Amino acid sequence: MLRRFLLGILVVSLASMAWAGVPDLVLSQAEIPAGADGALVFSTPNAQGEAFTAAFAPGGAVVDATISVTLIDTNGDPIFLYPFEDLWLETSLGSLSYCSGGTVADQSTDEMGMTTFSNPIAGGSYTDPASEMTMVMVAGAPISGGGVDVQFNSPDISGDLTVNLTDIVFFTDMLGGDFTDNPLFAGDFNYDGQINLSDIVRFTPGIGAACP
């Protein structure tokens, strides 16, 4: 009887050890600061856009849209030193284009299982504020919960990860009020609801930008 009891304990212990360090996508969490819902992060393929700490709220006010992640394993314990390169951002409709490694976490998880996304990303194209969310991917699978409401746009309007003549034409059309090919959001780089000189100032330095 004792032998059978000890064997049962051993089996349970081994099972628990086997799941230790394996992310549980339901228990794990991703969140943004209060007041950052719908914030825009201006991005470029060469990662010279804005940090998440300098995102724009609808209307143009600067807000902190840092994405905080807590990674929990299937035993309910925080995962320490989960590799930052295995944590990255995608968007729910796939609109965000990004370079290899261009949306990875700031660092590997700490002893509390936490890390952040705050650095400028290397990416392009634009998302759909009406229906798209940002997903935190863990080794290729998204954390449950539907994602966080962070949006992106870029001088790389076409999303081919190079800011070139195509993007200049697209931006010029939008500047002139022609939104046939792209919506206003695609060229409203400070999210103030209009395309004007402030957007030209952001677009122009990005010309020629490409993945690192």
How should each PLM-predicted stretch be described?
Residues 8-17:
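Bacterial N-terminal signal peptides
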Residues 20-212:
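Cellulosome-associated attachment modules in secreted, modular CAZymes
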